[in-house]
Amino acid sequence: MAALSDRQKDELHRAMLAYLHAAGMHNAYAALQHDAALADVDPRDRAVGLLEKKWTSVIRLQKKVIDLENRNAALLAELAAAARPAAPGPFLPRPPPRHTLASHRAPVTRLAFHPTWTLLASASEDATVKLWDWEAGDMERTLKGHTKAVMDVDFDPRGGLMATCSSDLTLKLWDTANQYTNVKTLHGHDHSVSSVRFMPDGETLVSASRDKTIRVWQVSSGYCIKTFSGHAEWVREAVPSEDGRWLVSASNDQTSRIWDFSTGETKMELRGHEHVVECAVFAPVNAYPAIRELAGLKPPAPRDTRAKSPGVYAATGSRDKTIKLWDALSGQCLRTLVGHDNWIRALVFHPSGKYLLSASDDKTIKVWDLANGRCTKTIEAHSHFVTSMTWGRAVGASGGIEKVNGDASSKEPRRINVLATGSVDQTIKVWTP
């Protein structure tokens, strides 16, 4: 009671006395009245009912305090959640690039990442191939040997050999472990060679040419062992499926073809574009669910081996400014993606299987959500036409080297988040998180 003033004590006693009187507690009333030397309760006294009011106020205040404490706890939880780093989503390129690599004296035509080293190879119309440390942003060497524009470059699955092709009608093999010595020059095409790819076994090469053919080469001997014919015009590109069973090609005849690699037969002709088909690529198996959702297809039966087989779906890009997604087995066009303002030059499926990236002569990269076909992101990538685009490779869970595009492994490989683009502006840009 020491904390109360005399006036407060008097008001408290009178309030208690009024409460005891109203409650009929006569003995307690008489004792308090005697001890506190108070007169009888006056019904008009403002102390009448005061104790009940105070008690009710305390209960209301306690409830308010509890509500405020709960609200404060919720706000603190929200604050803590906001302060925690967000779970990393799929890597998508965003400006600015990590490096802009400049040394070529003519447009960059194609790019390839080494499967194990932090090395990027760039092919150019200046007739050279340049090798870059993409992490440091430094140029390591320039390779000369072709006499005309170098149109494409690729590394074998283990990185021991590099292949190039050129408008000089030849392909060349370079030994990466021996100062990039040119160990073989392959002759056979009758016109510019526009595309070269190692098959997954690393023992064969496939090339596409303006002579309207696709050729298969034995790496060990350098001999042409197969020639695929069928296109009516320049074959721009020929790309194998992840298991090497199929090839998809793009041509000036406005078609794309699916080839059986073992027989050289055309299994399907994809018609629908209204101009030159510049690029074609198979979808990786992990993109199949999103593509089926986009096309409104039912999930496959559990025993349907097609659901996990490489080469089921493909994408093509054309000078008609569109991208088409295809069922490669039936030849049906599942969806046409529209958004670019100029030729489509390169297509890459995102390693997550959720997106498709496209590069165009409108100087941009576009990111397409495969599940709904919408463009979710546009990146102003270069000051001139974007001619090429490629992902870094991936190290498999078993330690083997697997390419990011077309991964059909049941064990998720360790992804390397790096994308490179090349341009008519003579630069290469490296995009990392």
UniProtKB/Swiss-Prot annotation:
Gene Ontology molecular function, alphabetical: dynein complex binding; microtubule plus-end binding
Main localization (coarse): cytoplasm
GO biological process, one term: cell division
Subcellular compartments: Cytoplasm, Cytoskeleton; Cytoplasm, Cytoskeleton, Spindle pole
Cell division recorded as keyword: yes
InterPro entries: Dynein_regulator_LIS1, G-protein_beta_WD-40_rep, LIS1_N, LisH, PAC1-like_LisH-like_dom, WD40/YVTN_repeat-like_dom_sf, WD40_repeat_CS, WD40_repeat_dom_sf
CDD domains referenced in this protein's UniProt entry, alphabetically: WD40
Pfam families per the UniProt record, alphabetical: LisH_PAC1 (PF24951), WD40 (PF00400)
Placement of WD repeats on the sequence: 103-144, 146-184, 188-227, 230-269, 272-336, 339-378, 381-429
Claim: Cell cycle is one of the keywords in the record: yes
Domain LisH: 8-40
Keywords per UniProt: Cell cycle, Cell division, Coiled coil, Cytoplasm, Cytoskeleton, Microtubule, Mitosis, Repeat, Transport, WD repeat
Subunit-level organization: Self-associates. Interacts with NDL1 and dynein.
Family of the protein in this entry: Belongs to the WD repeat LIS1/nudF family.
UniProt function note: Positively regulates the activity of the minus-end directed microtubule motor protein dynein. Plays a central role in positioning the mitotic spindle at the bud neck during cell division. Targets cytoplasmic dynein to microtubule plus ends, thereby promoting dynein-mediated microtubule sliding along the bud cortex and consequently the movement of the mitotic spindle to the bud neck.
Protein name (record): Nuclear distribution protein PAC1
Native source organism of the sequence: Cryptococcus neoformans var. neoformans serotype D (strain JEC21 / ATCC MYA-565) (Filobasidiella neoformans)
Lineage, broadest ranks: Eukaryota, Fungi, Dikarya, Basidiomycota, Agaricomycotina
Gene from which the chain derives: PAC1
